[in-house]
Curated annotation (Swiss-Prot):
Lineage: Bacteria, Bacillati, Mycoplasmatota, Mollicutes, Mycoplasmataceae
Domain of life: Bacteria
This protein's name: Phosphate acetyltransferase
Catalytic reactions on record: acetyl-CoA + phosphate = acetyl phosphate + CoA
NCBIfam families for the chain: PRK09653.1 (NF007233), pta (TIGR00651)
Any one GO BP annotation for this protein: acetyl-CoA biosynthetic process
Length: 322
């Protein structure tokens, strides 16, 4: 799996730079990240300010940072496009209201190819970031949902945890999509021979219940598809994580690596708790979340994100836009 430093180096070598829109330009962290992206030749930031009075002189005087001030921005084209996209679900009056919100402007910039990707969430909820993306940018063909992943990193260990942030209790069919999105993400990061474990409190029928059936059915659907990766489940975390334990608990398991690349959690409770245990008790760095399944990259920040968190997420978002 590519490290962040390797991804950063790849961005620096790209002759054509991608643009990333930040709807929360009033944040000093966002402004610092924008300057860093320019200084290190990683991407082209677009900063959305609510008012022209908010734009600091060092941003205003930096010709490599584009600014858009909503108090001076004509939203008519965006409002008309929003009404078309919503197909009768929004009037022009509703469109006018939502186009006063920076996240909606940012998503529309991406939709109309005036920006390549978007990063928000430092001062907004996940819903406030993802809702405009779903309404305007939409999901990729073949997907009915968006999903999220964290890259859990410690030394040479790198794992993908999904879905820890978006889907509360996914159906079997949604778990299939969540797994497929995570596999595609792993491949984009140069993971070879991808393996995914679909987690449960049961290993290969050792436990019973509706939640076990939901995961087991997802695995059956995945195994029925033609694919170039390995998936297995339902499986408990200890068996998934450690091959010796797996060999005892799950005979003829198709997972061959010591530890699989992807851990698919059965619901948001397990995923959210799981990544935070790995982070706080296990000493893993949680990079993300990254939103998957959208037509163009939009990512969501934690409201407690630091400069480094925002920069790393911006770098990954730009990388995914190529």
């Amino acid at each position: 799996m590519y490290t962040l430093e390797e991804i950063k180096n790849q961005l620096g070598l790209k002759s054509e730079k991608k643009s990333i829109v930040f709807p929360e330009a009033e944040s000093e962290i966002i402004q610092s990240v924008a300057k860093t992206l320019v200084d290190e030749k990683l991407g082209l930031p677009i900063l959305l300010f609510k008012s022209s009075k908010e734009v600091p002189s060092e941003i205003k005087n930096n010709s490599s940072i584009k600014t858009i001030c909503l108090d001076e921005f004509d939203t008519k084209e965006f409002e008309e496009e929003f009404v078309k996209l919503r197909k009768g679900k929004a009037t022009i009056e509703v469109a006018h209201q939502v186009m006063q919100l920076p996240n909606y402007i940012g998503a529309m910039l991406v939709k109309l190819n005036q920006a390549d990707c978007m990063l928000s969430g430092l001062n907004n909820t996940t819903a406030d970031t993802i809702r405009p993306a779903l309404q305007i940018i939409g999901t990729k063909p073949g997907y009915n949902i968006a999903s999220s992943i964290f890259v859990m990193s410690k030394g040479n260990e790198n794992y993908i945890f999904t879905d820890c942030a978006l889907n509360i209790k996914p159906t079997s069919e949604q778990l299939v999509e969540i797994t497929q999105m995570a596999v595609d993400f792993a491949k984009a990061l140069n993971v070879k021979n991808v393996e995914a474990a679909l987690l449960s409190y049961s290993t290969n029928g050792s436990g019973k219940g509706e939640d076990v059936d939901r995961v087991h059915q997802a695995v059956e659907i995945l195994k029925s598809k033609e694919k170039d990766y390995v998936c297995e489940g339902e499986i408990q975390f200890d068996a998934a994580f450690d091959k010796k334990t797996r060999d005892k608990k799950f005979k003829n398991c198709s997972l061959l690596k010591q530890t699989p690349d992807i851990f698919v959690f059965p619901d948001i409770n397990a995923g959210n708790i799981g990544y935070k245990i790995a982070q706080r008790m296990g000493g893993f760095e949680a990079i993300g979340p990254f939103v998957l399944g959208l037509n163009q990259p939009v990512n969501d920040l934690s409201r407690g994100a630091t400069f480094v968190d925002v920069l790393n997420t911006a770098i990954m978002t730009l990388y995914l836009s190529y």
